[in-house]
From Swiss-Prot:
It is a multi-pass membrane protein. Pfam families: 7tm_4 (PF13853). Odorant receptor. The keyword Ion transport does not apply. This is Olfactory receptor 10H4. Belongs to the G-protein coupled receptor 1 family. GO terms for biological process: detection of chemical stimulus involved in sensory perception of smell. The gene is OR10H4. Glycans are attached at residue 5.
Length: 316
């Protein structure tokens, strides 16, 4: 093949919100800042409540606490940089910083998905095998499950980041996104095998996510079958209520992800791509603590008992 003169890229420019009207950027900054702070405070409140309330020292709430940690870290990996770019004219990011951001976003994102799977398994064991629950979900087993979710997320993050950053980037250094998004970054690669790399990355990611979703759905098939065998309507309602918050978060998580990554090509613009991406990176983590604190009665009561009534006592 004839040799080509490539200008190797050492840093990237995040174009994300650069095309937006300037008067909208402070509004978006304020909106995303409030959502970011609420995400942090909401998840910290859940973690503090579980730590304080000894009745919540159960496997289900251990997994929920770990989920809150993963959501905080996922949000911190992306949102602060996005907020800074909204008010700045300097949007460059170094090669190493871009690789780090991609690794941590994938690591915490996949850890979140694996934790949702583990929480589904926990509900399956609690409802379908209640007599064996203490054996199957012992503290040691729970610790192993949590460790596996973090290890799995780390492996996925390292795998994708290593594959992508082994490519050579040349020509334009503009990433048409507000963070180092893998598909936007791959468009800047100058090697002939880029298309096969894209297919490989997509296959790895989709297989892992669809695999998690399939196992969650399978667990709920068995859960619903077990609930339908409960004779009283009150018993069925009480049992299913323990699953509602988890199921709602799963539906929200996968719905937004599917809408962003599986949308038909051509039905998007630079504006809509950036805004839709924030639904998954900002809005979904923002919703999660709201869903768990409102839909989980036991957690809601514990928050009221330990925080709301202390700081906002009822007027006499």
């Amino acid at each position: 093949m004839p040799s080509q003169n490539y200008s190797i890229i050492s840093e990237f420019n995040l174009f994300g919100f650069s095309a937006f009207p300037q008067h909208l950027l402070p509004i978006l900054f304020l909106l995303y800042l409030l959502m970011f702070l609420f995400t942090l405070l909401g998840n910290l409140l859940i973690m503090a409540t579980i730590w304080i309330e000894h009745r919540l020292h159960t496997p289900m709430y251990l997994f929920l606490c770990t989920l809150s940690v993963s959501e905080i870290l996922f949000t911190v990996a992306i949102t602060p940089r996005m907020l800074a770019d909204l008010l700045s004219t300097h949007h460059s990011i170094t090669f190493v910083a871009c690789a780090n951001q991609m690794f941590f976003s994938f690591m915490f994102g996949f850890t979140h998905s694996f934790l949702l799977l583990v929480m589904g398994y926990d509900r399956y064991v609690a409802i379908c095998h209640p007599l064996r629950y203490n054996v199957l979900m012992s503290p040691r087993d729970c610790a192993h499950l949590v460790a596996c979710t973090w290890a799995g997320g780390s492996v996925m993050g390292m795998m994708v980041t290593t594959i992508v950053f082994h490519l050579t980037f040349c020509g334009s250094n503009v990433i048409h996104h507000f963070f180092c998004h893998v598909l936007s970054l791959l468009k800047l690669a100058c090697e002939n095998k880029t298309s096969s790399v894209i297919m490989g990355v997509m296959l790895v990611c989709v297989t892992a996510l669809i695999g998690c979703l399939f196992l969650i759905i399978l667990s709920y098939v068995f859960i619903v079958a077990a609930i339908l065998r409960i004779p009283s309507a009150e018993g069925r309602h009480k049992t299913f209520s323990t699953c509602v918050s988890h199921l709602t978060v799963v539906v929200t998580h996968y719905s937004f992800a599917s809408f962003i990554y599986l949308k038909p090509k051509g039905l998007h613009s630079m504006y809509s791509d950036a805004l839709m991406a924030t639904t998954y990176t900002v809005f979904t983590p923002f919703l999660s603590p709201i869903i768990f604190s409102l839909r989980n009665k036991e957690l809601k009561n514990a928050i009221n008992k330990n925080f709301y009534r202390k700081f906002c006592p009822p007027s006499s």
